[in-house]
């Protein structure tokens, strides 16, 4: 009788559906850096890698993650890729903030910059921006070459002071107003002539923004996060 019961139990166990294991969020005593790469850069941190690495080195006990999104222009099309990035970023921020007490840092380049600022403030035909209560967990945000750059904002940085990006936010609009509520923890770097953030013709200006301003961005982040 006992042997039969044991065999039945084993058979039932073997045929049961596998149990999904809960994925636990890793928390850091330093900061949790989320890096969002630019268009058509290989999966991972892309051009933001140097900034992310410097932050990790400067703030002990920190960790990082590369935003998992298409970062594409044509397949899928740019707007869909940005939307995918927004949803992924909001999910990462909410998951970390719900599970951990540490601070979050956001770093984005080009399309990745667009993803970050749209996640914060919304955009045309984009998902609802993240609940501002979650941004209380974000200590610093630095973006480079953001196509939605709008000149004349207090958080603007770089050499461009007169031109807007190719997807600039509307002056006086709700999106730009919401983005300005995060001005104390945000820097948006854009240089004169940049094809995307300054509607210029200098492709090298776009690619040189992180090499030019990366150290300044790290100093800004460290000043707000330690």
Task: Set out the residue ranges of the language-model regions.
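Conserved hydrolase catalytic core segment
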Residues: 122-134
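Short, solvent-exposed loop/turn and secondary-structure capping segments
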Residues: 45-46, 118-119, 152-156
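Fungal secretory targeting signals
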Residues: 1-25, 226
């Amino acid at each position: 009788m006992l042997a039969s019961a044991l065999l039945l139990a084993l058979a039932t166990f073997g045929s049961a559906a596998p149990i999904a294991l809960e994925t636990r969020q890793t928390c850091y005593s330093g900061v949790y850096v989320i890096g969002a790469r630019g268009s058509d850069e290989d999966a991972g941190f892309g051009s933001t890698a140097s900034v992310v690495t410097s932050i990790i080195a400067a703030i002990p006990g920190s960790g990082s993650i590369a935003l998992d999104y298409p970062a594409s222009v044509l397949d899928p099309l740019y707007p869909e890729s940005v939307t995918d990035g927004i949803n992924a970023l909001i999910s990462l921020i909410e998951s970390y903030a719900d599970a951990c007490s540490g601070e979050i840092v956001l770093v984005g380049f080009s399309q990745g910059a667009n993803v970050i600022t749209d996640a914060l403030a919304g955009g045309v035909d984009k998902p609802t921006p993240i609940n501002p209560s979650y941004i209380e967990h974000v200590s610093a945000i630095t973006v480079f070459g953001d196509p939605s750059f709008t000149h004349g904002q207090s958080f603007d940085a770089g050499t461009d002071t007169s031109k807007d990006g190719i997807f600039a936010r509307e002056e006086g609009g709700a999106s730009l107003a919401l983005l300005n509520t995060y001005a104390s923890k945000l820097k948006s770097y854009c240089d004169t002539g940049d094809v995307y953030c300054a509607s210029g013709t200098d492709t090298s200006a776009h690619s040189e923004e992180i090499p030019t301003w990366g150290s300044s961005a790290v100093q800004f982040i460290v000043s707000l996060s330690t």
